């Protein structure tokens, strides 16, 4: 367990904004957690759990508390039968490493297990996946999530929680709502995957990719490679550009609202989803810069920090985008990344 003081949040998050955290503790083993929480309790300081920092925005006032940076690692097979396999990954592993591991396993008939291949190249850690119920290209983690192991800081003990206890929804779980916020440190995640390949029709852009190439076999590796190529063509490389990935949530409409939207020429996808990127782009904002934040010219739902020096700059840019979409379409966009610290 490593401990540091006065660490800029900007160094811990991919948007590269935010003041200093009073303490940062790196959690390298499960047994570190009791000591780390005891330290915070003795200091009477709040805690915050951070993985790769790709879905968190640091605020200018910093965090007068203790940030736990997740450094737990390890991926392994728990059990399997002829049709499926259960994989466990420690929460500090990259989600993409788990996906890569799953598509390279021999399943008895061919290479790879299916269930999370469309989540390829999503930035962030395994532990963050159930918090936000991450999803992309037609898959969500809740579709394959079996269970999680957590440290409950309220009860000061480790617990095993099944997926159906987590209230998983669109970017929603018990971990980011109500009393569950900050209560649990996820130490590992178990997914249950199957050997049967995905079948068309796929998510719109993924199906178009396969149609253009005449793809007929949809092995987990083929789907992973396709998603990786699509994401690379649309999304900024987090190693090169400061961003937090998808910045705005999609809009979800009921049946009546969906019909009204379609009558106005607004695309509505399965489940009543209106893509926020389409709204932003068609409001004329793609590639535009506000207060040092640029709307990506590849995918309009992404904000890139070109020269912003403060959370205040980001907040003004965010509001400019929200106002423009609201004025043109009447929908109010919501931010997807969480925020850390005081304004």
Where are these regions (language model features)?
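Anion-binding (especially nucleotide phosphate/pyrophosphate-binding) glycine-rich loop
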Residues: 1-155, 165
């Amino acid at each position: 367990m490593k401990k540091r003081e006065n660490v800029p949040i900007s160094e811990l998050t991919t948007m590269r904004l935010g003041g200093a955290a009073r303490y940062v503790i790196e959690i390298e083993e499960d047994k570190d957690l009791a000591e780390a929480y005891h330290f915070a309790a003795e200091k009477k300081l709040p805690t915050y759990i951070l993985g790769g920092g790709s879905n968190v925005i640091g605020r200018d006032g910093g965090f007068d508390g203790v940030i736990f940076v997740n450094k737990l690692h390890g991926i392994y097979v728990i059990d399997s039968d002829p049709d499926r396999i259960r994989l466990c990954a420690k929460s500090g592993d990259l989600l993409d490493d788990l996906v890569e591991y799953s598509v390279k396993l021999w399943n008895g008939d061919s290479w790879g297990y299916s269930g999370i291949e469309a989540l390829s190249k999503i930035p962030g850690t395994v532990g963050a996946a159930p918090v936000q119920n991450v999803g992309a290209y037609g898959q969500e983690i809740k579709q394959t999530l079996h269970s999680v192991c957590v440290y409950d800081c309220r009860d000061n003990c480790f617990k095993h929680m099944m997926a159906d206890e987590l209230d998983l929804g669109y970017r929603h779980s018990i971990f980011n709502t109500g009393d569950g916020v900050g209560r649990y440190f996820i130490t590992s995640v178990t997914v249950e995957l199957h050997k049967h390949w995905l079948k068309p029709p796929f998510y719109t852009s993924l199906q178009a990719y396969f149609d253009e190439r005449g793809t007929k076999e949809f092995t987990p590796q083929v789907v992973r490679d396709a998603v990786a190529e699509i994401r690379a063509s649309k999304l900024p490389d987090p190693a090169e550009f400061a961003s937090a990935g998808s910045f705005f949530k999609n809009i979800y409409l009921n049946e009546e609202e969906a019909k009204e939207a379609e009558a106005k020429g607004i695309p509505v996808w399965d489940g009543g989803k209106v893509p926020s990127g389409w709204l932003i782009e068609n409001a004329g904002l793609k590639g535009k810069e506000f207060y040092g934040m640029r709307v990506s010219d590849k995918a309009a739902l992404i904000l890139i920090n070109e020269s912003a020096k403060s959370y205040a700059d980001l907040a003004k840019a965010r509001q400019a985008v929200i106002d423009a979409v609201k004025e043109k379409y009447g929908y109010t966009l919501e931010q997807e990344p969480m925020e850390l610290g005081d304004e």
